[in-house]
């Protein structure tokens, strides 16, 4: 995958609204088993107050984001506009490089594509549970 021209860096405050829009758009396109109104920009912006948000920039536009909660080395969000181009891997590699230790994350059981991605990247399922009726798997990479 050619990443020439792709920049991954910490999001600027003035970019958070665009990140929230990308978050909502990708969730609504991907999580088709949930009502679209469940995904709100306000949820992302609330979490961004305590998380580090990283963006992938290509040709001057945000094409992906990762939200990272440093106290737990927890990857809270990883969303890209185009799948299969290495954007998610670039963001994951960047967050892994700035983390203080091994990453963990949760993935909805219904999101098989994400599970496959994380397994390819060396993550293993270490826990299963549910919140508000939504089943999830916790993945960790040592």
Regions found by a protein language model. Name each.
Residues 10-83, 89-94, 129:
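Acetyl-CoA-dependent GNAT
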Residues 89, 93, 110-136:
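Conserved active-site alpha-helix within GNAT-family acetyltransferase domains
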Residues 98-110:
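Conserved GNAT acetyl-CoA-binding A-motif
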Residues 22-26, 98, 117, 121:
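Alpha-helical interaction/dimerization surfaces of two-component signaling modules
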Residues 83-84, 110:
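Glycine-/small-residue-rich active-site loops that bind phosphorylated ligands and cofactors
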Residues 54-56, 135-141:
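Short beta-strand element of the conserved SAM-dependent methyltransferase core
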Residues 1-14, 139-142:
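Conserved N-terminal entry element of GNAT/NAT acetyltransferase domains
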